[in-house]
Amino acid sequence: MADTKKNDNYAIDMDKLDAESDRFRPPPQPQPRHSSSSHSQSISNSPVLPILSYCASSILMTVTNKYVLSGVQFNLNFFLLCVQSVVCIIAIQTCKSMGLINYRDFNSDEAKKWFPISLLLIGMIYTGTKALKFLSIPVYTIFKNLTIILIAYGEVLWFGGSVTGMALFSFGLMVLSSVIAAWADIKHALDTSGFSGAEATSKISTLNAGYIWMLINCLCTSTYILGMRKRIKLTNFKDFDTMFYNNLLSIPILMIGSFIVEDWSSENINKNFPIETRNSLIFAMIFSGLSSVFISYTSAWCVRVTSSTTYSMVGALNKLPIALSGLIFFGDPVTVPSVSAIVVGFISGIVYSLAKVKQNAKPRTGVLPTTNPVSASTQSMRDGLKS
């Protein structure tokens, strides 16, 4: 402290001497102006633009997928995912050739190691599209929070992780918001059907299918993320390396799955792509593929300009506009229970993010269960995952 204080006083004295000696110096030479470049650099380093870009790309991705899947007759889910993967590969390869991004070239040994992760990714995205087809965007977003619980306890079992009391409280809020959302959905289905037998049964069965797909999606998502953590440790992949291998290895599987499972008759194609909306649907499919690239870029931009803590908070706050987008663009029912579920789910995300911040600051305070010390590499991998 004494040395620091001496240095501070010395700095102040030198500033005074410099100020007094300015009058004996010749006038400074005019410097060339770089107003435009400095202005653009200040904008790119401002935290506002990357945060807004990340939120916008997340909303666009969800809304475009819902727009494609909301068609009554749409059932080509494997084809949709294949188009998105192809668009993503073309986009990032173009960016790499232009020198905007960089990632590893294809390696067969790395592809073999990463192939199981690509299978899990296909399962995660496919079940997500099926759930989004049957459920509204707010309900889908709320139930997606349950994945956080599975990942947290998966870390406890596989990586020596821990769950704090505050995180446990946020998990309770997540479960509560999911129960409220399901109750609101079922109540609205019964009210709109007038409690008539056939129509009510049809709507309830549709919701039940959505809940089942959502449960499978939560399991696939948590398994994918936990498995990816272990594989990244082996391959040392970066963000764009992961994106490249995930999409490239997924394309042949999705193509085979689409040709084997899905109906490619002319009648079914006309049902999936009606003439009056065909162009807009194709554009939405391509745009959703580009949105995945935007999300990866803007998330990395957000972490670089701000911090991983700010990024995790933005991810929690972003659930609110995503849920509201369903109410705005798709006419999802606006009722007291549905809005309450959104609010509780939003609060649970905030509480969980704060719990992670406190846990990283004081990792041994109020931790459940008690864990043994872990290695630095394991701790860094744990901190790198921001659910």
Swiss-Prot record:
Family membership: Belongs to the TPT transporter family. SLC35D subfamily.
Transport keyword on record: yes
Biased composition (Basic and acidic residues): 1-25
Residue stretches of biased makeup (Low complexity): 32-45
Subunit structure: Homooligomer.
Membrane topology: Multi-pass membrane protein
Transmembrane domains' residue ranges: 43-63, 72-92, 113-129, 137-153, 163-184, 207-227, 242-262, 281-301, 310-329, 333-355
CC annotations in GO: cytoplasmic vesicle membrane; endoplasmic reticulum membrane; Golgi membrane
Lumenal compartment spans: 64-71, 130-136, 185-206, 263-280, 330-332
Major localisation: Golgi
Locations listed in the record: Golgi apparatus membrane; Cytoplasmic vesicle membrane; Endoplasmic reticulum membrane
Composition-biased stretches (Polar residues): 368-381
Gene transcribed to yield this protein: VRG4
Name of this protein: GDP-mannose transporter
Origin superkingdom: Eukaryota
Its job: Involved in the import of GDP-mannose from the cytoplasm into the Golgi lumen.
Topological domains, Cytoplasmic: 1-42, 93-112, 154-162, 228-241, 302-309, 356-387
Source organism of the structure: Coccidioides immitis (strain RS) (Valley fever fungus)
Record key words, sorted: Cytoplasmic vesicle, Endoplasmic reticulum, Golgi apparatus, Membrane, Sugar transport, Transmembrane, Transmembrane helix, Transport
Pfam families named among the record's database cross-references: EamA (PF00892)
Alphabetized InterPro entries for the sequence: EamA_dom, TPT_transporter
Region described as Disordered: spans on this chain: 1-45, 366-387
